Amino acid sequence: MFDRAICTVFHTVHYENPLNVVVTVPWLGDKVLLCKRNIEPRKEKWTLPAGFMELGESTSQGAARETSEEAGAQFIMEDLFTVMSVPRVGQVHLYYRARLTSDQFDPGHETMDARLFSEQDIPWEDLALRTVKETLLHYFADRREGRRVTHAFDIE
């Protein structure tokens, strides 16, 4: 079940670890900010600002960096919202709430559009990733019920 690559000469383990994907759920009032992807995979699909964590940064710093790069948004980082293991692709997705301080955006080259959506206006069928959809469903359900909790689950 847990086969690892072990060097028979030096008796060391070659670790293959999952990648961390860091994301924000930028919100303003009853709306969330979505970015329309300008790169593959899933070009022209909508997503939350996201990307791979880089060496030397914390998960929240990485999520903040991605939000600045992809959306050009002004925001205040908040708390961890969802943690999802996606073993099929060797990733862990960490989503943070981020309160927007402006409704003006300056998307970077990876984003063709960035705009605010209310729950009923989200292009649910055009979302890039299942993890984004699951997070948004939790976000709006929690908002309706006045909850502020952290969710953790696996995506198969």
Regions flagged by a language model, labelled:
Residues P26-W27, L34, A98, L116:
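Conserved hydrophobic "DFG−1" position in protein kinase catalytic cores
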Residues L19, W27, P41, R88-Q91, ...:
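A generic fold-level signal
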Residues M1-T24:
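Acidic, metal-coordinating catalytic segment for phosphate/diphosphate chemistry
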